[in-house]
Amino acid sequence: MGFQIAIDGPAASGKSTVARLLAEKLGFDHLNTGATYRAVAVYLHEKGLSPSSAEEEIENALKNLKIDYVNGRVYINGKDYTEKIQSPEAGVLASNFARLEVVRRHLVRIQREICDDKNIVVEGRDIGTVVLPNAHLKIFLTASLEARVERKLKEYQKRGLKVTKEEVERELISRDEQDSKRNVAPLKPAEDAVIIDTTSMSVEEVLDRILKLVRERMNT
């Protein structure tokens, strides 16, 4: 088995930036599981399905699903979904579908297959608790709601999306509520995770902290 690093945390806590840069510095593969959930949610929505659809219908839609995550782009059955999953609506769809056991079961299996025997940095909301419970290092990133709203607002503005600060705050509060209170794989730190509050930390400071932990684990 390769060296696996799990990075969990709520939306806009810094997971994606830190995970991507950490993987680059270490020469590891990188998997953004949130992107796979958003892509599958959009895929199911395009097929006319919703979280309230019959489980059998969703099961059939997912049965022969093939997901590839290559250089930060996510493909479903060979079709690039990367641009489609960037909107706030895709994030809401993902949170709603992620509550379903049938969706999580299929995606956890696929995510584990992607990670198998790799040196890899994996980011998400249930990596250390469900997807990779035996990861060599588990990190849980957190930050104040105010800091996360500012980060997400800048991200949307950079993409040219017109959203207000109030809309972003409502989105994050709603996603936090759904992620932490869902019955299946709720968002929470693994018991052996290192919790890092990134509110007042720069990306470089967070990376330095995690790299130090990686070196310690690799040398034990």
UniProtKB/Swiss-Prot annotation:
Which family, according to the similarity comment?
A: Belongs to the cytidylate kinase family. Type 1 subfamily.
Give the Pfam families listed for this entry. Answer: Cytidylate_kin
Q: Which InterPro entries match?
A: Cytidylate_kin (IPR003136), Cytidylate_kinase_dom (IPR011994), P-loop_NTPase (IPR027417)
Coarse class of the protein's main subcellular location: cytoplasm
For this protein, what is the EC number?
2.7.4.25
Q: Which GO terms describe its molecular function?
A: ATP binding; CMP kinase activity; dCMP kinase activity
| Keyword field | ATP-binding, Cytoplasm, Kinase, Nucleotide-binding, Transferase
**The keyword Metal-binding is assigned to this record:** no
- Protein name, as recorded: Cytidylate kinase
Q: Where in the cell is it found?
A: Cytoplasm
UniProt binding sites for ATP:
G9, P10, A11, A12, S13, G14, K15, S16, T17
Output the superkingdom of the source species: Bacteria
Which gene is transcribed and translated to give this protein?
Answer: cmk
CDD domains attached to this UniProt entry: CMPK
Q: Which Cys-Cys disulphide bridges does the record give? A: none
Q: Which GO terms describe its biological process?
A: nucleobase-containing small molecule interconversion; pyrimidine nucleotide metabolic process
* Catalysed reactions listed for this entry: CMP + ATP = CDP + ADP; dCMP + ATP = dCDP + ADP
Its Gene Ontology cellular component terms are:
cytosol
